[in-house]
Amino acid sequence: MPTINQLVSQGRKKKVWKTSSPALSLVYNSLNKKQTEIPAPFKRGVCTRVATMTPKKPNSALRKYARVKLSNGFEVTAYIPGEGHNIQEHSVVLIRGGRVKDLPGVRYTIVRGTQDAAGVANRNQSRSRYGTKKPKPKS
């Protein structure tokens, strides 16, 4: 507990808040070659590498990920959700924030069903998350 004199001389410090997805908060202006902080929910980018990665300990799998060069100049690692994908090198994708807990360094997720990333086939639950259209009713 600080004394009154300590509070008068220094005051209370505001807690510094750090974003968990920094690449979404910067915009690059190519005319004057400067970056400006304008937060955005999504960013577009081009895939430079598509590969698999093994998760941290107790889990075991081959998780699919892509290195994406964003429109603001950042290059980030993004997770490809769902079973099966059609993403290749030079595919244009949309990314959103959202880390994958068991993949170190993966802070972004690719949005399925937009740009070059197709939705997950034969998916009936949580369809909006995986960009799948509503199935036609069987008559």
Swiss-Prot record:
SUPFAM superfamilies recorded for this chain? Answer: Nucleic acid-binding proteins (SSF50249)
- Alphabetically list the UniProt keywords: Ribonucleoprotein, Ribosomal protein, RNA-binding, rRNA-binding, tRNA-binding
CDD domains with a match to the protein in the record: Ribosomal_S12
Gene3D superfamilies per UniProt: Nucleic acid-binding proteins
Q: Which Pfam families match?
A: Ribosom_S12_S23
The family annotation for this protein states: Belongs to the universal ribosomal protein uS12 family.
The protein's name:
Small ribosomal subunit protein uS12
Q: State the species of origin.
A: Mycoplasma mobile (strain ATCC 43663 / 163K / NCTC 11711)
